[in-house]
UniProtKB/Swiss-Prot annotation:
Gene Ontology cellular-component annotations: extracellular region; host extracellular space
SUPFAM superfamilies named in the record: (Trans)glycosidases (SSF51445), L domain-like (SSF52058)
Family: Belongs to the glycosyl hydrolase 18 family.
Outcome, altering residue 108 to A: In loop 2 mutant; does not affect endoglucosidase activity
Reactions the enzyme catalyzes: an N(4)-(oligosaccharide-(1->3)-[oligosaccharide-(1->6)]-beta-D-Man-(1->4)-beta-D-GlcNAc-(1->4)-alpha-D-GlcNAc)-L-asparaginyl-[protein] + H2O = an oligosaccharide-(1->3)-[oligosaccharide-(1->6)]-beta-D-Man-(1->4)-D-GlcNAc + N(4)-(N-acetyl-beta-D-glucosaminyl)-L-asparaginyl-[protein]
Subcellular compartments: Secreted; Host extracellular space
Effect after changing residue 184 to C/M: Reduced but not abolished endoglucosidase activity. Induces a very high transglycosylation activity
Binding site for Ca(2+): 699, 702, 704, 707, 824-825
GO annotation (BP), single: symbiont-mediated evasion of host immune response
UniProtKB keywords: Calcium, Glycosidase, Hydrolase, Leucine-rich repeat, Metal-binding, Repeat, Secreted, Signal, Virulence
Region: carbohydrate-binding module (CBM), residue numbers: 678-832
Binding site for a glycoprotein: 72, 74, 88, 107-109, 184, 250, 252, 288-289, 295, 339
Protein name: Endo-beta-N-acetylglucosaminidase EndoS2
Species whose genome carries this gene: Streptococcus pyogenes serotype M49
Length: 843
């Protein structure tokens, strides 16, 4: 989607000839420049009580799907600018219809001493309250973070932030007589907020939440956030979500996909981890006069010269799509909102104007300000209220009144909530007698039935469809349960079912599931307890104790027994996966190694009845190891990826088996008598001299092939110290093309080189000054060749004749081409020895 979410921009009033040709388009951040009004106003007690009742009804969902709108104060006829002049006489907040549940006071271009403010608190609040509309003041987040307004007058300390929060609530809520506070948080395209500013804003937000909102001391006020930001980009939201009444997400313009709601769907997957669907509102924008490119959303119908009323039609609009959209999980959304509701009914400028700019504005007649009757808002509210998904859950849905009450409390009150709820439902108490209606919660993830002593029957028909997938079932204290039928629910265990409490059980059916009822499994014990409970009331029969036809699901084992394997030296090829890493386990961790073992497992029986389905096959049960990989490290640290080894000589391998993503098994494999595992003696070696770059030279001893050493010439040498005398048996050079970070051509490989040790083993290099040491190390006369390299292969490997040395040098004598050669790592392989042992071996 190639557009910026420049949402909720406000357009300055277009005043007479001076501003006629230009759009004063400002970001929603214009809120941040508005100072709170200092004058205190007493709101009548009646209005306070009415407002409190409205807030309670809204918060409890008694108003149905909500419709809210942002009214731009400078478009109210009472508003005047700093010059004292009226700006737009066409509209007034007083005419906002009852279909608007929440009206946001979105102020800008309105002077602090404008008559608008007295009209708001003395007239508009009362009038709108009487029709059932709550009013909420909107401010920008910069009012909280120290950038603008009151926040500039308070220090960023716990005490300062607490005082600032109180001042904000007083100035913007109490003194204006409104019903809550809305804080706008958007992306900053210039002068971006810092993490420190966001941290302060969050601290102040939390202090505000102590004062107002659902968790505040004054619960008669709403606390709302509106934003353009997704969850991952909004740390303030994540920190305050639990205190919000509503989250209003601005989705102005297309959101992708055929239905233009792809982004909304994606965002909701994250939002539902923090808020309920009943707190989530999505918003569109009416067309703002003189809007230019970047602020043209096309959320309402475009101007049609043949249909003057086109702007009042909602058919085919994005606004209607938003009204109809619902989350697929969690529940029904709270509702929708509109920005610039004072432009309701005005058609959008045609798409042919989509590239117009504020500096060269191509005007259209829809840019003119006109009176609105809020037709679109009325239609959208009606559309939502007539949506059958918002019908209240009744006795037809859930006959048992006690069950219905608990479901409404936890899931929501609307029919559409039932099929979307995807969390945990906990049912408790002896008032519930009938579970009919539970099946409607098709996406329920966990069901807890606790102390339902008057529920006598549980059957698959009464349980959610999700029980056939992976939903969890908990049953505790079901003392009155007589019939338990969990047949065909794909249950893999009976975990969560307190079978000891089902003391009145007369029959059960757990057949046609995926249970492991083998002798040592936990589910076998639970089965025997169930049978005992039935036997306390009647004789056990096939009809009253069904458990047959199980098809346990197979899993890869979490661990494998073999920690050290062995092959004889027989010159034969062996497969490590086949011999040491194999088998399948049930959910209860019963291990079945092969088809023969599975056949034996199938013969298992309880009370003479075979519990595994006769048509269940080993192929359907077993796990396939085809995607598994085996990484072998030989005694000389040579590495290969293969599950097959040929036992031709004594050798030892360290074996790592991975499932393609992670290592699942580690073992040691000996062939014949095995071999001593060597070490890379050069890993972490100290570079003591080089003809090249000293810092770069350290890279060849860091154990990583993601970096490389540049020789910067056809010849080069590096001298290094192993720290002590060691026994070296092999050496290995990883050439340029082994680089794991940057694809490197083999033409950059080293082709010729020499590995050397210091002749004089008694010399103390530490006592030399830097100049003398470099001269000494660079002199070929002081070194003895112990190996030569004459091949430009990717990994050059060669044996050494049990070389004893502490100080080594590697000389590059030529590359594979005219390019300067490179290499990534140098290894000296062998065993570490104490100085005493090394000296003894040398003698």
């Amino acid at each position: 989607m190639d557009k910026h979410l420049l949402v909720k921009r406000t357009l300055g009033c277009v005043c007479a000839a001076t501003l006629m040709g230009a759009a004063l388009a400002t970001h929603h951040d214009s809120l941040n420049t508005v100072k709170a009004e200092e004058k205190t106003v007493q709101t009548g007690k009646t209005d306070q009580q009415v407002g409190a009742k409205l807030v309670q009804e809204i918060r409890e969902g008694k108003r149905g799907p909500l419709y809210a709108g942002y009214f731009r104060t400078w478009h109210d006829r009472a508003s005047t600018g700093i010059d004292g002049k009226q700006q737009h006489p066409e509209n007034t907040m007083a005419e906002v219809p009852k279909e608007v549940d929440i009206l946001f006071v979105f102020h800008d271009h309105t002077a602090s001493d404008s008559p608008f403010w007295s009209e708001l608190k003395d007239s508009y609040v009362h009038k709108l309250h009487q029709q059932g509309t709550a009013l909420v003041q909107t401010i920008g987040v910069n009012e909280l973070n120290g950038r603008t307004g009151l926040s500039k007058d308070y220090p960023d300390t716990p005490e300062g932030n607490k005082a600032l929060a109180a001042a904000i609530v007083k100035a913007f809520v109490t003194d204006r007589g409104v019903d809550g506070l809305d804080i706008d948080i958007e992306h900053e395209f210039t002068n971006k907020r810092t993490p420190e500013e966001d941290a302060r804003a969050l601290n102040v937000f939390k202090e505000i939440a102590q004062l107002i909102g659902k968790n505040g001391s004054d619960k008669s006020k709403l606390l709302i956030m509106d934003t353009t930001l997704s969850v991952e980009n909004n740390p303030i939201f994540k920190g305050i979500a639990e205190d919000l009444d509503y989250l209003l997400r601005q989705y102005y313009g297309s959101q992708g996909g055929e239905a233009e709601v792809d982004t909304i769907n994606s965002d909701w997957n994250q939002y539902q981890n923090y808020i309920d669907a009943s707190q989530f509102m999505i918003g569109f924008s009416f067309f703002e006069e003189s809007a230019s490119k970047g602020n043209l959303w096309f959320d309402v119908n475009e101007y049609d010269p043949n249909n003057p009323e086109k702007g009042k039609d909602i058919e085919g609009t994005r606004a209607k799509k938003y009204a109809e959209w619902q989350p697929s999980t969690g529940g029904l959304k709270a509702g929708i909102f509109s920005y610039a509701i004072d432009r309701d009914g005005v058609a959008h400028v045609p798409s042919t104007y989509k590239n117009r700019t504020s500096t060269n504005l191509q005007r259209h007649e829809v840019d003119n300000i006109s009176h609105t009757d809020y037709t679109v808002s009325r239609k959208l509210k009606t559309l939502m209220t007539e949506d059958k998904r918002y019908d209240v859950i009744d006795q037809k849905d859930i006959p048992d009144p006690a069950l219905r009450e608990q479901i409404i409390q936890q899931v929501g009150q609307y029919k559409g909530d039932l099929e979307r709820y995807n969390k945990t439902l906990v049912l408790t108490g002896d008032k519930i007698q009938n579970l009919k209606g539970l099946e409607k919660l098709s996406k329920l993830q966990k069901l807890e039935l606790r102390q339902l002593s008057n529920v006598k029957e549980i059957t698959p028909e009464l349980l959610p469809e999700s029980m056939k997938k992976d939903a969890e079932l908990v049953m505790v204290g079901m003392t009155g349960l007589e019939k338990l039928n969990l047949s065909g629910l794909n249950r893999q265990t009976l975990d969560g079912i307190d079978v000891n409490s089902i003391t009145h059980l007369t029959s059960f059916d757990i057949s046609h599931n995926s249970l492991d009822l083998s002798e040592k499994s936990e589910d076998r014990k639970l089965l025997m307890t169930l049978m005992e409970q039935v036997s306390n009331h009647q004789k056990i029969t096939v009809k009253n104790t069904a458990f047959e036809n199980q098809k346990p699901k197979g899993y890869y084992p979490q661990t494998y027994d073999t920690k050290e394997g062995h092959y004889d030296v027989d010159n034969a090829e062996h497969d490590i996966l086949t011999d040491f890493v194999f088998g399948t386990v049930t959910k209860r961790n019963t291990f079945i190694g092969d088809e023969e073992a599975f056949a034996i497992y199938k013969e298992g029986a309880v009370d003479g009845r075979q519990y595994v389905s006769k048509d269940y096959t080993y192929e359907a049960f077993r796990k396939d190891y085809k995607g598994y990989k085996v990484h072998l490290t030989a005694s000389n640290l040579g590495e290969t990826v293969t599950s097959k080894v040929t036992a031709t000589t004594d050798e030892t391998y360290l074996v790592d088996v991975s499932d393609g993503e992670k290592v699942v098994h580690h073992m040691k494999l000996n062939i014949g008598s095995g071999a001593i595992m060597m070490e890379n003696l050069a890993k972490g070696a100290k570079v003591i001299g080089t003809s090249g770059d000293f810092e770069q030279a350290k890279k060849i001893f860091d154990g990583e092939k993601s970096d490389r050493f540049f020789t910067w010439g056809q010849t080069n040498w590096i001298a290094f110290d192993l720290g002590e005398i060691n026994l070296a048996k092999e050496w290995r050079l990883f050439n340029a093309e082994t680089n794991t970070e940057i694809k490197t051509d083999s033409s950059l490989n080293v082709a010729k080189g020499r590995l050397q040790i210091l002749k004089d083993t008694t010399i103390d290099l530490e006592k030399m000054d830097i100049k003398n040491r470099k001269e000494y190390l660079s002199n070929d006369e002081n070194w003895t060749d112990v190996a030569q390299m004459d091949d430009a292969k990717a990994i050059f490997n060669s044996k050494l004749s049990n070389v004893l040395s502490r100080y080594w040098r590697f000389c590059v004598d030529g590359g594979a081409s005219s390019y300067y050669p490179q290499y990534t790592e140098l290894q000296i392989l062998g065993q570490r020895l104490s100085n005493d042992v090394a000296n003894t071996l040398k003698d």
